[in-house]
Amino acid sequence: MDHSLAKKIILDLCKHAFEDESIKLDVFGSIATGLALETSDIDLVVTGLKIEGRDDAISHIRTLKDHFEGCQYFSNIKAIEGASIPVIKLEADLQKLRENENSKNTSIVESEMRFLQIDITFEDSKEKKSDFFWEGFEWNTSKLHLGMKSIHLVKSYIKEYVHLKELTLCIKKLLSVRDLNSPYQGGLSSYGVIIMIVAYMNFFSLQNAWVNISQLLIHFFDFYGSKFEENKVGIMINRGG
C-alpha cells in the first residue's frame, strides 16, 4: 500500500512537471521480478516523453528534481547525471504519506522502514528501439533503457534455474548489510548478482541440481573469491558461463 501511494504521488508530480497526462510510470528491477528484500529500493521508469538523446534525459532529470524538492514527502533528492542512464535518487517518507492518505487513523511505520529509497529514470517510449537480447546490443546508443526488458529475462531464469531465487536473495542480503549493493558507490547491482549466479551455474552445470542451498552459496563464494581469474576471463550467461 505504501509503495502504491508513493508511486501515485510521483506519477502526479511527473504529469504536472511536464504538463502531460499521457505519462506513465512503470516498476522494474527487484520489485518486479520478485527478488526484493524488505529494504530494497524501488526502480521506476517514466515513459511517454520524447527524448532525442542524453541531453534531453538530463534536462528532464533536472526539471523533475526541482518539483520533488518542493514536495514534503521526499528528501535526499539527488540527480546523478553522469550515470549510464541519468537517474534521480530520493527517499519517500512513508509515515507522511500514510498521514496524508488517512489523517484520522494512521498506523506508525517502523523506524527502519520509514524511508523508502526510490530511483527514477526515463525511457523514450515513442521511438522504436532494437531488442537488446535478441538483436544484439548497440554500444553507441545512450537511449536504450534495459530495465523493462530485463524483467522477462530474469523471470525466465528463475523458472529455469533451481535455487536461483534463494541464492540471489542470500547474496543480496549479505551485500546489503555490508553496504555493497549500490553500483553508484562501487557496489554490485541485483542484476549483476543474477548474471554472476547464472554464469556460475552454467559453468558447473547446476541449472537443475537439487543440492543444499548452503553448499551452493559456499561454492559460489569460493569460485569467485579464490578461483575466478578476472584478469584472464570474463563472465557470460551463454556458451557455458
What are these model-derived regions, one by one?
Residues 59-133, 138:
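Conserved catalytic core of two-metal-ion nucleotidyltransferases
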Residues 137-190:
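Basic, alpha-helical interaction scaffolds
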Residues 1-27, 100:
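Helical scaffold of the NTase/Pol beta-like nucleotidyltransferase catalytic core
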Residues 11-15, 19, 61-69, 85, ...:
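Amphipathic alpha-helical interaction motifs in eukaryotic regulatory proteins
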Residues 26-30, 45-49, 80-82, 91-93, ...:
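Structured beta-strand/turn binding interfaces of compact recognition modules in eukaryotic regulators
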Residues 12-17, 23-24, 31-36, 52, ...:
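Beta-strand elements of modular eukaryotic interaction domains
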Residues 29-69, 116-122, 197:
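Catalytic metal-binding acidic patch
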Residues 170-173, 187-189, 195-241:
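Pol beta-like nucleotidyltransferase catalytic core
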